[in-house]
Amino acid sequence: MFRLPKKVIDDIQKYDEKLKQFLSGKINSTFFRGVRVPWGFYSQRGGKLLMSRLRIPAGILTPSQLKAIGIAAKNFADGKLHITTRQDIQIHNVPFENSIKIIDYLKDFNISPRGGGGNTVRNITCCYLSGICSKEKTEVYKMVWGLTEYLLSLEESLNLPRKFKIAFSGCEKDCAFTGVNDVGVIALDDGKFKVLCGGGMGAKSAVGKVLCENIDQDEVYYVIKSVFNVYNKYGDRKNRHHNRLRFLIEDIGWEKFYDLYKKELDNIRGNEYIPIRYENDVNVLPELPDAGLIGCSEDETYNLFIKHNTAKQKQKGYYYAEIRIPVGEISSEELLKLCEIEGFVPTLIFRTTQRQNIVLTNIPYDKMFYVYEKIKSIFSDFLYPETVLDIVSCKAATTCNLGICNAIDLAKNIIEELNSKLDTTVIEKLKDVKININGCPNACGQHPIGTISFSGLARRVYNRSVPFYKIYLGGKIDGENTKLAQEKGILPARVIPKFISELVLTLQGSLNIEYLTFNIEQLIKKYSYVPSYEEDKNYYIDFGKTEEFSFAGLSQGECGAGVIDMIEADLESAKQSLIKSKEKNLEITDIKDALIYSARALLVVKGVDPKSEEETIFGFIDKFINTGICNPEFKNLNEIYQNIVSNKITKEQAYEYTQKFYQEVKKIYSLMDSNFNFVARFKEIISTEDKRQKHPKTLTYDLRGTPCPINYVKIKLKLEELNIGDVLEVYLDDGEPIKNVPKSLINDGQEILKIEQVKNFFKVLIKRKV
């Protein structure tokens, strides 16, 4: 099974420290957002509670893990959960102070929200039947687990230009939607693989191109790391609306991108080793005496369940059962009851799907009726997964800050409408019709790949706001040949259920897109009328609401939260402190705060996390003044700070200096490039007693006993003290230090001259190149 890397466990203490600082008022909410979002904690609508997105690599969970998630949701929140389109599970309505409790409790079950949000490598998905499907060429879930363990061990995986999504499909049927991921891997015959690159959904959705094919399994990891490195080096970190991998490829062109990728691949092959753990299988199933068949019953619902929810596994005598979880909404109570099935089916393993369902696997044929009875006692609406009734929806306006419309309740109303109009025969004919809904233009509900799909927006009608949806048609998954759904028009939200019902009834099992296009265009015209408020006020009220539709609750999205947020939070705090000081007759405490906020703002880019005001001041002097990035007129920064603290400077002088310093820091920030590099506009300041040697030198630095990533940060700081061409000899421990630190330094552009093992530690020779 998947193992949570030690780095993730070690980093929990850092999160705990920042949480305590936030709760005690030592850091503000914007700064803390840059900390919590990469830990998978998003602010919900209203800002008072959090959502915790737990990453579930490959979507596979043991009963004990699923039970732990249910317990965490019950004990640390209000028991409401949501299954996502990337096979994650979200715990909703989490008080801020309970976020650390979720992290700490679930780590013992190898579950974590780490990397569930922000500019990180997101949950790596794969076919939800990987390992039990008779059609798969390779059991790709094992690759997902190994790659996830590796990437979560890398510091750079948590500070990318933007989110980075990876998917694995076990065959060319492409159940994992590889074509709409940043990197998609498809298993071919004879243990070979094809890798796609540059796909994605959301703003300017795109289908990935073939980067390479017919490569071996071991090569896949090097290819992915090469793409990862290119994106990390050249992706635009400052423009939040244009910083996905597909935009980098668009800006520089495929040929230039491919050249960068090939150079990076050659560099990694020659200098790195990617350690992937292969001993990560799901437990081997005991052999059954015979294959066995599941019999029929007088219970008609059971017969429908067998027909539509179950199928054989490739393992003799075993079956799986997929439970349709309407719009992915489930409670902790339901999860915990579901886990009780393990008592009768000890081989049970759970899986989450891209259509927000739960699959029970490894069920012996003679125990299926018991499983059905248990499922029936828990859920009231569980038949027909992967059909027209299996509607995908994001959380939308129920909890999401960006949600315009209430997609969740629209989906529930569509399901209710279809259930009242469709019989079993029609549902069977429409099994390939996929309906996807988003509450806003973003693609959390994956509307670009739906057969029929919707994204929320608003329009003014008779001077009132009305919830509307864009309508899309024709999405189809097929690797690099994936077709994205095309926009066909807009309709008011209130008519969508009847519109869908009439549309699917005209299909009669035909998915001819030309025929469907004609019908959809005619129906859009039919349903496009919006009556006045006096005539029918329901048009002006969203599904699931009683009040009139409005934009109340909308706020800034947090998906890209990270370094930029932390910088801008400190700059804004500095600005507000200066304003407060002026309002209070130049209050000296506010002036001092503005000075500290200004000095701290950019230190995060240099990997400095000061624990005191003094460390902040000296950190800025060392990283920005002495290096020529900041105007040397501020070389007396520490002297001014000390004078402010000891009241040896007038309020007017302190305010004027701090105001100028704040403006200088803002200017430095404005000149920072998209890769967080700064322009050295002035000469370096070198003290007489600390002059650097003009000829190359070699220093020794013993970091034995220093854990990751502290050892890496210390080496970076030490290298900055050296001239270009100088050599640093470092002593590193075996294990994580020797595995991770050299690779990180190579990614920084440094040169590793030699790695030599000496008894139980390693000597590493590093040449400063940049």
Give names to the regions the model predicted.
Residues K763-V770:
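Core SAM-dependent methyltransferase catalytic element
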Residues M1-K580:
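Peripheral terminal and linker regions in Fe-S/redox and tRNA-modifying enzymes
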Residues G562-I579, A599-S687:
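Long, charged low-complexity segments
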Residues N585-V604:
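Short, hydrophobic, well-ordered secondary-structure elements
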Residues I710-L717, D734-Q750:
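Amphipathic alpha-helical interaction surfaces in cytosolic regulatory modules
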Residues E689-L722:
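An N-terminal amphipathic alpha-helical segment
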Residues D108, D748-E756:
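A glycine-rich helix N-cap at a beta->alpha junction
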